[in-house]
Amino acid sequence: MLDINEILERFKKNRFVLKALQNPRSPSSVLNYMCSGDTNDPLVKKSLNNINIVSPLLVIWFQSGQSLDKLCKPFIPTVRELKSKPKTLIGNEWDSIDGKIAKVLLADQLSRSCFRGTSEAFAYDEIARDLVHELFNEKNRNETLKKPAAILYLLPWALAHSENIKDLESALSIIELTVKVYPEFTLFEGRNKQAVYQHQQVLEKFGRYPQRNNALGRTSTVQEKKWLDDKANLPIWAGGKLPIDQDIK
């Protein structure tokens, strides 16, 4: 089994990742970068339903920390285009299901890496949430659910990152849909759902995500400061050590 550093080094040298960085203003480039392969290739699409193939990608998505922040910088102009008025990320490519998914990944995943530690890391969250709701509305749901499991795994995170607990309830509903389509892809019932539950617990406790306070210029309460200092009870995704399958105290 490869260790984290080996996975990261292979990702940085992957030809589809490098090609995506040369043409970042393209939905296929966003998808290829996130999936570390040619997502237009039927064999690659099929492989993205295999948990053994997808598991190393979890390192890229959730354990890479700052190590890939510099690599993804070419996506910054495209991320910022999400807020352009009038809208510029439009047309057949961007308005397709794949295009909408790519915009979610730009707004929710890549923005956090491109702008880590600043308020801009969260500036595109509303765009990502609205797009996920659109992807799973009555009109688009069936088409969206045809996408590979790895892609579907990433979409609920845009809702889990919301500080509106109703969005997290929607995230759980989406996960239930994906479980029915891919019952053998255990990351949905496992890590995906567990992460949403943990995010819910934080919102129920504080009404917001305290680990964002510094970046957003918010003043932490005494209770929030105490929690942020308690690394053993602070989730990994908030900078602590608490595993994703354990409850917040």
Question: Which stretches of residues belong to each language-model region?
Answer:
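Intrinsically disordered, low-complexity activation-like regions
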Residues: 1-102, 106-249
